[in-house]
Amino acid sequence: MRIDLTDLSYQAFEQLSNPATTSFHASEYLQSRLQIREFYPTLTKMYSGNDLMERLLHAFTEAKPALSSASISRNLRNWTNKKTVPQNREDIFIIGFALNLSESQTSYLLGFISDYGIHYREPRELAFSYCLRIGRNYLEALDFINQLPPIPPLKKLPDAGFESVRTQTIMDHFSNIQDDETFIQEFKNNLTNFGVLHLRAYDYFIKSFECLKNPYPSFDPASSDFKVEEYSIERVMDDYLTLHMPVGKKRSNYSLIQKMLKADWPNATSLTNILNHKKDVSRKLLLLLYIVTEGVLNDDYDELDEEYLTDEQRLDEHWWRINLILNECGMNELDPRNAYDWLVLYSLNTNDTIGMNEKMEQVIQFLFPSH
């Protein structure tokens, strides 16, 4: 296997890759035995000093003078007691600066609480990443941001479909900059290239969505010809993407795992908003599209079709390919100790007798038996 895993992650992997793990057993494992990776323990592995809480208290008190010390302390206690996690990206940057974390560590924490790591095409996050790199603190980073040239209204809609500058290009321009003068000049050069949405994820989304919306032609006996039918967004959702997941927002009676899996599950409205460039492509949707299409978007030769590959080799290759996609899109790689990722990996471990989407749907049916 090409993926390096910790002991706990490997235990989770062994369970999902075991041929004896049926869909029912998978649902039970998710509900009661999977050791979910948690925010605060992850943070303590990045910063092992004894003054972690003191640093965070000082940093948030400086960064948010309008909040009382009691309110800040309560938030920090909730994080350490695993009751909540930071809810906005700015808080993660404050943590990154307070603990002298690297860009990659801060980006990972952002991806931990949201769909994406540092968004290098978003000017504020780009400036934060530079300030992390050169060792500034949060307040110094804010001062630096205030010195930057005014930014035109950020674009939500890609120019000419797919011709906007991608995040990777921005990263390449800025990743090695170590001084303010060079950063500001490059910043000026890219003012029209900044944007809000993640375009690479949209690229992957639209390719997969088009495959589902325009399935292979079917033979029409009435006309003795092949007919191409374009599916509606609602039909794509119903036929391919629901997978027995309950609809609606009610979650009060759900377990933690049920809430994790149902959260941000796509629906026809969210698909429409993504297609209209009003909403970002979620990590959950991107992975779901891979499962439903099995990573196949055309008829080109693929080594995964070869019979000499073992199930273990196929799983390893799918895992590797998905991680490449996630990295390209600025998302965290698959984590066997993340509930949804575990389900994705379990679904990838399939053979000719059952499709990936069927395998995922069976587990969801056991997890939500009354729906």
Question: What would you call each of these model-derived segments?
Answer:
Residues R2-F60, Q147-L148, P153-K155:
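A short, Lys/Arg-rich alpha-helix, primarily the initiator
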Residues D51-R55, R89-F93, E125:
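A generic alpha-helix surface/boundary motif
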Residues L57, T61, A66, G96:
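The alpha-helix within a helix-turn-helix
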Residues E62-D91, L109-D115:
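Recognition helix of helix-turn-helix/homeodomain-like DNA-binding domains
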Residues R77, F93-F97, F128:
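Amphipathic alpha-helical segments within well-ordered protein domains
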Residues R89-Q105:
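DNA major-groove recognition helix of helix-turn-helix/homeodomain DNA-binding modules
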Residues E103-P158, L304-M356, I364, F368:
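Short amphipathic recognition helices of helix-turn-helix/homeodomain-type DNA-binding modules
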Residues L157-C329, L334:
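Long, charge-rich C-terminal accessory regions
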